[in-house]
Amino acid sequence: MTPQRIGFVASNAPVAQEALNVMAARYGQCPLPEADAIVALGGDGFMLQTLHETQSLDIPVYGMNRGTVGFLMNGYAEDGLRERLAEAEEEILNPLAMTAVTGAGEVFHRIAINEVSLLRAGPQAAWLKISVDGKVRMEELVCDGALVCTPAGSTAYNYSAHGPILPIGADVLALTAIAPFRPRRWRGALLPKTALVRFDVIDAQKRPVMADADGRSVRDVVSVEIRTEPAVRHRLLFDPGHGLEERLIREQFV
């Protein structure tokens, strides 16, 4: 079925705004809740923002790259958009759910499509205790931080921190240490997708830590729990032969 009603959104970048004007004039602009498909014009950061803002609509999102990297985006072209949408392959992503507790007792809930990261917020290294499914697995990780990522997010911050790239269909999460000092050679672990990961911050007042879920931060955390959220799904559209699985494989040979 060829989508007839398309809702366009764009980042603030001039090139994305120009594309928005061109595409909306050519294909029409439908209010997002009434659209058959949403077309996001921008880069990966804007795609993540769009997925977060439209997650309650259950409408597929097709990205067109008007940014830099564009890992989650398709190539930009003004012609044949409806045909591309009709032929696109859909990928379903389940995000991570983060529950962060601060030293003041505040509780924050966040959703992350790529990763949840903990980062030292002061000059001293973070000290983290790591538990998985209620069992302490590491009493003390001395590091700049740590993260938990989905397969879709494994090529982002995780890969830069020397974490593994995960196949898109793998039912696993990557737990990756960021600049670990002790244990010095410990890089991280692969965990079942169903795992509940908990970080407890040791000596949080002296060694403050912030938690970040896809760019949305919580400062002065004392504990963070992370799990997959199966009740939330994000629908991404990709051109045939250029889905996430192909992109993940290609990323490892560049």
Swiss-Prot record:
Main location: cytoplasm
Active site: D44 (proton acceptor)
Reaction it catalyzes: NAD(+) + ATP = ADP + NADP(+) + H(+)
Source organism, top-level taxon: Bacteria
Keywords, comma-separated and alphabetical: ATP-binding, Cytoplasm, Kinase, NAD, NADP, Nucleotide-binding, Transferase
Alphabetized Pfam families for the sequence: NAD_kinase, NAD_kinase_C
Subcellular location: Cytoplasm
Disulfide bridge map: none
Keyword Cytoplasm set for record: yes
Cleavable signal peptide: none
Residues reported in the UniProt entry to bind NAD(+): D44, G45, N114, E115, D144, A152, T155, A156, Y157, N158, Y159, S160, A179
Root EC class: transferase
Cofactor field: a divalent metal cation
One Gene Ontology MF term: metal ion binding
Gene Ontology CC terms, in alphabetical order: cytoplasm
GO biological process, one term: NAD metabolic process
The EC number(s) this enzyme carries: 2.7.1.23
Similarity remark: Belongs to the NAD kinase family.
Known function: Involved in the regulation of the intracellular balance of NAD and NADP, and is a key enzyme in the biosynthesis of NADP. Catalyzes specifically the phosphorylation on 2'-hydroxyl of the adenosine moiety of NAD to yield NADP.
Name assigned to this protein: NAD kinase
Originating species: Cereibacter sphaeroides (strain ATCC 17023 / DSM 158 / JCM 6121 / CCUG 31486 / LMG 2827 / NBRC 12203 / NCIMB 8253 / ATH 2.4.1.) (Rhodobacter sphaeroides)
